[in-house]
Amino acid sequence: MAHADLATEQSLRSEIDRTDHNRRQIRGWLAVVLFALFALVIVGGATRLTESGLSITEWKPIHGVIPPLSAEEWEEEFRLYQRIPQYEQMNKGMTVEAFKTIFWWEWAHRLLARSIGVIFALPLLFFWLTGRVERRLRLPLLGILALGGFQGFIGWWMVSSGLVERTEVSQYRLATHLVIACLIFAACMWIYRGLSPHTGDAAPTQRSQTMAGIIAAMSLFQIYLGALVAGLDAGLSYNTWPLMDGAIVPGDLFVQQPAWINLFENPKTVQFLHRAGAYLLFALAFAHMVVSLRAASGTTHARRSVLLFVLLTVQAAIGITTLLLQVPIVWGVLHQAGALVVLGFAIAHWRGFVGEYPRPAAIEVRH
């Protein structure tokens, strides 16, 4: 009997060790994916801020990997760009050399996006075929892969909105493109954190997990509002802080009809909403931190709540500086990077309350 129990325990320990080993490998893979996604969003922000997103006027998922290699090919690519309204109305007289600058930004963004597809799909196939992907993760990972493929279509759908009548892409499509990218990033972070060892600290209060989820959701919503701000160049509407046009609430927020359209197409209203959302998010994070410190100051959850508030404070300072400086490229990119850092940490913090995915046996492991 004792021998049988020992054999069972050894078998169980072997299974746990194998699970831990597989999880470390998948976490390493997801860490690379997260880094690549972060880089993609940053390059995408720089592409937008340099007004380079419309420089490639065709969608060639495979052939588009190869850039122009000869003077003739560059001339042909430039001729395609000269057909769209952005060239006619904004860049008339641009040289081929100047065109190359904006072309390389968009090409790099598309190449990085394609590369992430490979970075995600091939290791996933390997882990799947070798039995390293736990059953509970199969559908979520396939969902992320499918969403990534759909994101490629959304990217072209966004670009196409600026090729016919407009000199820029639709703010609605820009927001959709950025939010989907952030959803993919958040989903990868959620799984990555769920595969990581957790402490056994109890939540500071019964509502701590709910509040962490609200902060994460609000962080994503702020990114959506930020995308509308970017698409409308709303960051140039009021370049003062804390007042807007000398008032807390400016008077021309609902000048368009119907009134609801101002929420999406009035640059001043959209900037006001982005500011208001930032204040709300800041207040929620501050309250969450205070409650966590009072209820359980020595826990990992409380320490994470402090770091989350610090990250939000830094992001707010970057946002205000970006506004006051009238959105220079470096600060605009830094603000977008900060938003993704806040979102990623908010997701990880929220997942910390949920805990890691169950193991083959109920054994607490703390690293």
From Swiss-Prot:
Belongs to the COX15/CtaA family. Type 2 subfamily. It comes from Sinorhizobium fredii (strain NBRC 101917 / NGR234). It holds the Pfam family COX15-CtaA. Keywords: Cell membrane, Heme biosynthesis, Iron, Membrane, Metal-binding, Oxidoreductase, Transmembrane, Transmembrane helix. The keyword Membrane applies. This is Heme A synthase. One of its GO terms (molecular function) is oxidoreductase activity, acting on NAD(P)H, heme protein as acceptor. InterPro entries: COX15/CtaA_fam, HemeA_Synthase_type2. Disulfide bonds: none annotated. Pathway: Porphyrin-containing compound metabolism; heme A biosynthesis; heme A from heme O: step 1/1.
